């Protein structure tokens, strides 16, 4: 896999230039074609055929990379479309609750919960509050910052009521 300079405009033969600030801002129309090789972007295709180009980020000096979606930097139209697709896929499972992982998963979880008709969602956190219970936390690491060891907490007040045994 080949990576360009971070922050440089990207061009793929026959597919034009995507400036760094243009990623996640809109979709290519269905049938527009996608680049054959994934050098600088990955064409994520939605069920309706539209394509969201995701920049490929180098993973250190490994020669490997990941396709990146930063929801807090995408346009409202992209967030809306992704929430619709995810809600449509989740609807048959009839989830009782939607849980969002900080920070980048929170906007999507909120939008998906709304589309599913929920009155709320559960936002997990990485900053412990004095009323949190360590038993309701798990270790957390990230592919983008593997050295940072954090904990992921759920606010005990956000747990659904326990059903009584009969």
Q: Which positions does each model-derived feature cover?
A:
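Short, glycine/charge-rich flexible loops or terminal/linker lids adjacent to PRPP-binding catalytic cores
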Residues: 119-165
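A generic local structural motif
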Residues: 84-86, 108-109, 151-157
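Short, catalytically relevant binding-site loops at active-site mouths
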Residues: 104-107, 128-130
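Short, flexible loop segments at the rims of nucleotide/cofactor-binding pockets, characterized by
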Residues: 74-78, 100, 143-146
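Active-site-facing substrate-recognition patch
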Residues: 7, 14-95
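Short Gly/Thr/Asp-enriched flexible loops that form oxyanion-binding sites at enzyme active sites
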Residues: 107-116
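Short glycine-rich phosphate-binding loop at a beta-alpha junction
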Residues: 95-102
